[in-house]
A protein has these predicted regions:
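Short amphipathic alpha-helical interaction segments
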Residues: 45-57
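Short alpha-helical segments that sit at the start of domains
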Residues: 1-22
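Short, cationic-aromatic polyanion-contact patches
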Residues: 69-81
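A short, conserved structural fragment
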Residues: 59-69
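Alpha-helix C-capping/helix-to-loop hinge sites
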Residues: 22-23, 42
């Protein structure tokens, strides 16, 4: 498992948010496994705990909203960053 400074992790989460926003926008949702796979690739994580922590951070930062165990809604990224 790779460790990243907070600033670098924030940028990686923003990149994931922008990627999915450009794919589906606000009209459709993505699946939780799809988001977890993107986090796994971007952060180079293998363990589920670290992936789950990043999903929770994305919820805390209001980047995503989880409707159920599988539906994940992407919130619109800030344009000023």
């Amino acid at each position: 498992m790779a460790k990243y400074p907070d600033g670098e992790s924030l940028k990686k989460r923003e990149k994931i948010q922008n990627y999915f926003w450009n794919q589906v926008g606000s009209k459709e949702h993505i699946s939780l496994p799809m988001l977890e796979h993107a986090i796994k690739i971007e952060f180079n994580y293998e363990d589920d705990r670290s992936i789950r922590a990043q999903v929770n951070l994305m919820q805390t930062e209001a980047r995503i909203r989880m409707e159920s165990r599988v539906k994940v809604w992407i919130k619109q990224p800030n344009k000023n960053s």
